[in-house]
Amino acid sequence: MEQFHGTTILSVRRGNIVALGGDGQVTLGNIVMKGTARKVRKVYNGKVLVGFAGGTADAFTLLERFESKLEKHQGHLMRASVELAKDWRTDRMLRRLEAMLLVADKETTLIITGNGDVLEPNDGIGAIGSGGTYAQSAAKALQENTDLSPEDIVKKSLTIAGELCIYTNLSHIIETLD
C-alpha cells in the first residue's frame, strides 16, 4: 500500500508572535485524496502549535504521543520534544513511523524528526514537508525585507510553495500565538 505523503508546514516567529500554517492536500501516490486536511493544530490548552508532515496515520500517532508528553511535562516544549524524540528513536514500532513534527510555543520553535533530532531554527523560521524548502526560502525573504506579520508571511510563503510543489495546494490553515 502506498503512503499518504506530501505537504508543507511553515512556522514564522517575529517579535512575540508566532504563526504556524500548513496546506490541506493529502495524496496517495499520484492521486489527490483530499484538499482540505487539517495538518496544523493548537494543543495543550491552546498554548502550543503543532504541524505535521509525512504519512497521515504515522503523523497522528506522533501527534498523540507528543500531546501526552506535553501533559506529562506540564507544557515544557523542549522537554516534551526531547522525550518524544528519545521514544521515537528507541521504540521498535515508533522507529518505523515516517513523519515529522514542527512545534512552537510563545518562546521556542522546534523541528522533531524520526532520527531523534530536535532542531531549533536560528532565524525563527521552521519548515517541513515536500514544499518546506520553497516556503522557508520565501518566508526568509519576506521576513528580512518586509514588515509583514508572521501570519501574513506564512500565508504568502505557503502560496508560493503551493505554486511550486505538486504535493502542496493553496488551501491553508494558519494558527497563531501572541
UniProtKB/Swiss-Prot annotation:
Taxonomy, superkingdom: Bacteria
UniProt main location, coarse: cytoplasm
Keywords noted in UniProt: Allosteric enzyme, Cytoplasm, Hydrolase, Metal-binding, Protease, Sodium, Threonine protease
SUPFAM superfamilies: N-terminal nucleophile aminohydrolases (Ntn hydrolases)
Entry keyword Cytoplasm: yes
Keyword Cytoplasm: yes
A molecular-function term among this protein's GO annotations: threonine-type endopeptidase activity
EC main group: hydrolase
GO CC, any one term: HslUV protease complex
CDD domains: protease_HslV
Mechanisms controlling activity: Allosterically activated by HslU binding.
Annotated positions binding Na(+): 162, 165, 168
Annotated EC: 3.4.25.2
InterPro entries with a match to the protein in the record: ATP-dep_Prtase_HsIV_su (IPR022281), Ntn_hydrolases_N (IPR029055), Proteasome_sua/b (IPR001353), Proteasome_suB-type (IPR023333)
Gene3D superfamilies, per database record: Glutamine Phosphoribosylpyrophosphate, subunit 1, domain 1
Cellular localisation: Cytoplasm
Catalytic center residues: 7
UniProt GO BP: proteolysis involved in protein catabolic process
Catalytic activity, reaction form: ATP-dependent cleavage of peptide bonds with broad specificity
Function, as annotated: Protease subunit of a proteasome-like degradation complex believed to be a general protein degrading machinery.
Matching NCBIfam families: ATP_dep_HslV (TIGR03692), PRK05456.1 (NF003964)
PANTHER family per UniProt: ATP-DEPENDENT PROTEASE SUBUNIT HSLV, METALLOPROTEASE TLDD
Protein name per UniProt: ATP-dependent protease subunit HslV
Species, as recorded: Janthinobacterium sp. (strain Marseille) (Minibacterium massiliensis)
UniProt gene name: hslV
